[in-house]
Amino acid sequence: MPSQTSSKTYPAGSIWRKWDLHIHSPASVFRNDFAGATQEEKWRNYFTKLATLTDISVLGITDYFSVEGYLKVIREGNLTNVNLILPNVELRILPVTGSNTAINLHIIFNPSVVEDLENKFFSSLTCSYAGDSYKCTRSDLIKLGRKYRNSELLAEAAAYRDGVEQFKTTITELRDIFSKNKTLAENSIVIVSNRSGDGNSGIQHSSLAATREEIYRFAHCIFSSNPSDVSFFLGLGTDSKKEVMRKYGSLKPCVHGCDAHDLDSIGKPCIKRGKENHNCATAADCEMRFSWIKADPTFEGLKQIIYEPEERVRIQEHSPYDDKRKVFFESVSLTGSTNFILPSTDLFLNRELVTVIGGRGSGKSVLLESLAFLNEEHLKVDRNGKKKVIEFYRDNDSHSEPPPSFLLKTTLVDKDGSKQAFQKTLNEREGLELPFLYLGQEQLSGMATNDEELTKTICELIGIDAAELNQQELIVEAREVLAQIKVDEKTAADIVEAFKKLGYRDGEDLEKWTEQYLKKLSAQQARLSSKETREALTEINEKTQRGIKLKGLVAEADLVLVTLEKLDANETLKTLEKKINALYPDIKLSPVDSKKQVQEIKAFQEKANSEMELLRSEIRVKKAELIKKGIKEDVNTLLQSSEAIQRQISSVGTDLENYRIAQKAIASGKASRNALMQRIRNSLNRLNDHISAKFVEFQGSRDDSSAEEKELFEKMIAGIGIEGQVVFDDRELCKQLLSWRVDNRKIPSESDLRKHIAGQQPDGTPKGLTLDNVIGWVKADLGGSKVFNRGGEEGTLDYILTEWPDFLKVKAVVRLNGKPIEVLSIGQRGTLLLKVYLSTSTVRQVFIIDQPEDNLDNNFIMNDLVPLVLKTKKSRQIIMSTHNANLVVNADAEQVIVAQLDVGKPYLAGSIENPEINRSIRDILEGGEEAFRKRQRKYHEGVG
């Protein structure tokens, strides 16, 4: 018998294909409506019809209590248009349904055990009748038919038909057979019909409810195309998944076939068949419900629907790929590899989850880096600055001859199905801008260990700018306000100094002092305003001035007299005359006589002194008259004109007004200063609210997307929260103020400074220092106490108002499930970052991720990362290298690429169900066996 254990491999992995697992053949003993005058003609027509099928990958040839029709198709059908033919044995089991019909139960066997079915399965099935026991073999079924008809002469074909019709088995018997033969059990898939007529749902009596549940529990799958059945057995209907698993042992996938008993029905699983006025042979309005199974067309592929009943099978007319069109890489090839670490490679890629596995140095990461290289997004250096693979070979650091080279090609399929080819050589350094997001191995693990970098990256990805507050604008304004206050304070201080020269003293009330001073000037001006006073003052002034002049002349005359008295001019003249006579004897010099001049000078002095005495007497008289009028000031002061006094009054008044203006400006400036503190806080609060609002905006950013895309997005961001938080670093503020601004003799410690700003508790400890305390302290002019060093008060205000970013910040607080980043484990941080990366990518982007599980614990991978990947791959292609079995097995990777460069072998690609791939997963990945056990337990109660 030809082998049906296909040796063909499917390197692109699990893809959606049509499977029709319920097609009867001319060997059927019931409803053999296949066209043909003879049995041979029926078979010829049947084979011809099967050969015309163009888009069905797997056929299930169905026989009642045998595999006779299947064997004939295998031996004689010569079908090259299908990938696999499976034997489907249809049984009748008790109890009967409400329509008094036995329940249809199907068992699909692995072709590898077909040769053993006669001895190990059919011979083990028995049926008792009239005191005799019959096996489910052809010879015994003929005997049963003849016994039932009570005719040993009944024709063999008729007897066989009657025997098959009367043969019934039970779940108990089938369970016993499979329990005794593990190989048979492992190579069989039990499917129960759910039709009310001949299916398990036809058992309606409440007394048989447990029996009905037990039949479902025994079955792996349900034959039904009813959407309500599909939902119910997946735990998406009236019963929860947990309840379905409790009742029936596992979630059950539904499959559907054409159940063809005639040629026209083959490959046409139309649910309108049999309805009035509908003929599947001619009607164009057939409603087809094909079974689409995402798996290799192998028996192991079919078993995958048991482990992933919700994701591996669909019942619908069109391909599931049409439901979720996506951008994906269809292939990647590296040709002309010269002195490069990767040999020439050609890989088809699955459009869903592609996982790359392998040992250290096997080539799994370099394959992903080569894809990232297309966009120049590959990592150039590692954390230590060492060149990564692509750059090492690109720069020929190994000095190879000829230099390393290759041509990397890829085919990108767009959502509309159009394809575009791209290529790039090793030496080209310009990215192709292909739609993918690449996350290198060190990107996730590196950021996950740095709180600040992780928060910054997450905020940037989401579009939150925690630096949007215009700090510089506020700081410049603060400097202007403080500078103006300083100018106004200097103006006021200069005016005070001017008043001090007029008699003002520190501590006096300046307003009162100027009031008194101006009154004094006004009174003086009033006294000087009468004619008599002005004439008296003028006369005194004139006499005083004359007296001063006389006094000066008398003093000058005294000097001349002294000179004349000391002058011995005649002796000098005689000496000179002698010298002249020596030359001119006839010349004579007359003697000098100064007595007359002396007398004249003394006469002048006597007259002047007499006049001065008279002037003094007259001045005394005039002053006495003024004193009587109450005028006691110095004459010079009194002699100032009324206009001069008025000018002084105006000057003092102007200075006072300027002082008042300066004081108002100072008060206004301080109000602006205080308001600026509040504005700084308000700005921080606005930024705080901005951060929170931006995250809310991000949460709603997919509101206009499809329901499915929105649901995926919500799953991705589930548990993530970002909010703003104003951070007041009171320790930094205290540190800066204590460094030089405050007088450490008066405030020696941080505790003392806190008490000075915020106050103290009853026990003497400082109260908590808050931003409100600081704002209040500034408003109170820093407490008005002398606790600062020289320039310290000004420096403190300047620091608080212009260097506040040192101690005041707005921080974005990122949380996962309510916990801030700071308390998350490395694994939780990595998952958080990955969730954000995935949720912020565009719908067109392919995800290329290198070992995302690094630093993640297995529980976290299973509970968080695996569900995330399962959801994401529905709308995005994911290409991911990993050494974690759960990310391959329990994320149900559609394609596994085994990297084997370390042992000198090329890449091996295929599905999880591919035996060679399956072995590699178990051998290479730590926890591979356990991962498969978890997968089996996921939707099955009590599977260990």
Positions of PLM-derived features:
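Charged catalytic cores and adjacent phosphate/nucleic-acid-binding surfaces used
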Residues: 1-56, 67-124, 195-361
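Phosphate-binding glycine-rich loops of NTP-binding sites
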Residues: 59-62, 110-111, 350-389, 830-839, ...
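Pre-NBD coupling/linker segments of ABC/ABC-like ATPases
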Residues: 253, 286-333, 686, 693, ...
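Conserved ABC ATPase signature
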Residues: 348-365, 440, 812-836, 852-860
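Nucleotide-state sensing region of NTPase/ATPase domains
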Residues: 391-443
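C-terminal lobe/lid and adjacent interdomain/linker elements of RecA-like ASCE P-loop ATPase modules
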Residues: 403, 422-426, 862-944
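Extended, charged alpha-helical "arm/stalk" segments used for dimerization and assembly
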Residues: 421-497
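Extended, charged coiled-coil "arm/hinge" scaffolds of SMC/Rad50-like chromosome-maintenance ATPases
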Residues: 487, 494, 501-823, 829, ...
